[in-house]
Amino acid sequence: MKSDLLLLVITVVVALIFDFLNGFHDAANSIATVVSTRVLSPKLAVLWAAVFNFVAAFFLGTAVAKTIGRGMIRIESVSQYVVIAGLLGAIVWDLLTWWWRLPTSSSHALIGGYAGAAIMRAGFGVIIPEGWHKTLIFIVVAPIMGLFLGLVLMVSVFWLLRNKAPRRIDVWFRRLQLLSAAAYSLGHGGNDAQKTMGIVASALYGAKYLTSAELAGNWGHFHWPIILAAHAAIALGTYFGGWRIVHTMGSRITKLKPVGGFCAETAGAITLFSTALAGIPVSTTHTITGAIVGVGATTRLSAVRWGVARRIVWAWILTIPASAIVAALLFWAFRLVKPDA
């Protein structure tokens, strides 16, 4: 019993480390545009984003956590070793792509890792098709939503302010971009911290501290300490952030002015709020990249650096299978040591 409790503690700690790395790796997306447009210095930008990552705990519910915890993998096939192997697979992939300066999705690395470990334990029957359908569909839909909204917002702003002096527009949108960056960071914290909450719920089930009925219920067991811990971890990760990726997101895809940064962040925030409330675990990276591309394309298609965007897309395509393979191998290694893992 003591060993089971120790393993649960280790699993929760690894989950919070993943959450921290999610902030370190992904939350750069929240500040890339506001840094690129020089509205905030990098140090102030990370503090701004971190605060709103944490504040999201009080606004966006637990719908995404429920999807991760019981909507994608048949929970009866989950053990603590599945959860920890899935987390480690995602962490390994996140660190590799951080080193390679690729803004891939920590969310999809987590989903891929969790699935890979579960499949290695119990076969492909553990997959819940309905949960995967909406997640896989939104791998495509989220960046398209971001692109479309960014394009529409940018065109609308150009039309509404067509007779205003460019310098005055720049002053206005420097102020407004503080709000859009805050909104995007709120959406990021609300969507991504919940994924860690869902994984913690799976670990509690695997350790038999939670029944399947409780997992399927109203999640009254998700007390505030767990919610606050998940949001605090991602906020700290943001604060200590991933500057290698900020450079790629904020300046190498397209050059942005404050009006473009505002439109991209607002488009991303709208997408993240709507999907978080609907319980769809989307990628913040996909979303903001689509929005930046949409904004850049309003000037001219050549303003978008398609070579960089293409490299990023390839990293997206590889994320779920790569993290799944790493996690499956880790679970296989666990089984060599503990056959009933």
Where are these regions (language model features)?
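Multi-pass alpha-helical transmembrane bundle typical of ion/small-solute transporters
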Residues: 1-341
